[in-house]
A protein has these predicted regions:
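Active-site-proximal beta-strand elements of phosphoester/diester hydrolases
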Residues: 3-15, 100, 113
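Conserved functional loop/turn residues at catalytic and ligand-binding sites
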Residues: 10, 35, 122
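Cys-nucleophile CN-hydrolase/nitrilase-fold catalytic domain and related Cys-dependent amidase chemistry
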Residues: 17, 29-107
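Conserved small/polar residues in nucleotide/adenosyl-binding loops
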Residues: 116-121
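Short hydrophobic alpha-helix segments
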Residues: 107, 113-114
């Protein structure tokens, strides 16, 4: 039986998307250097966790799946490090918004995509 090492991370996020992505990449590199083969970064890490905030400006954070800059960047990192990255992102598909998860394989290929319609979920947090 093959042994697989999985890492799950948690980090404080800000409204600075670039800083959050860089911090996530640093965590991925650290986990990889310690032997993790599958590395999970927290849900919707590009910004503060906004689904519990009733602010229309948050819809500006959504990006389409095709040619998604975050997925492309993380795909390159997965390939470089040879790790699997389940990657959460806020997706816009026409006028529908999803809390999506792309599975990026160790060769950088996106294997699967799972979607949850973000506005149908109850608010389960408070600020």
């Amino acid at each position: 039986m093959r042994e697989v090492t999985v890492a799950a991370t948690q980090m404080a996020c800000s409204e600075d998307s670039r800083a959050n992505i860089d911090k996530a990449k640093d965590l991925i590199r650290k986990c990889s250097s310690e032997g993790a083969q599958i590395i999970l970064i927290q849900e919707l890490f590009e910004s503060v966790y906004f689904p519990c905030l009733n602010d229309p400006k948050n819809f500006e954070l959504a990006k389409p799946f095709d040619n998604n800059p975050l997925l492309n960047e993380m795909s390159d990192l997965a390939k470089e490090l040879g790790v699997v990255l389940p990657m959460s992102f806020f997706e816009q598909d026409n006028n529908t918004y999803y809390n999506s998860l792309a599975m990026i394989d160790a060769d950088g290929k996106i294997l699967d995509l799972s979607l949850i319609h973000i506005l149908t979920l109850p608010t389960i947090c408070s600020v």
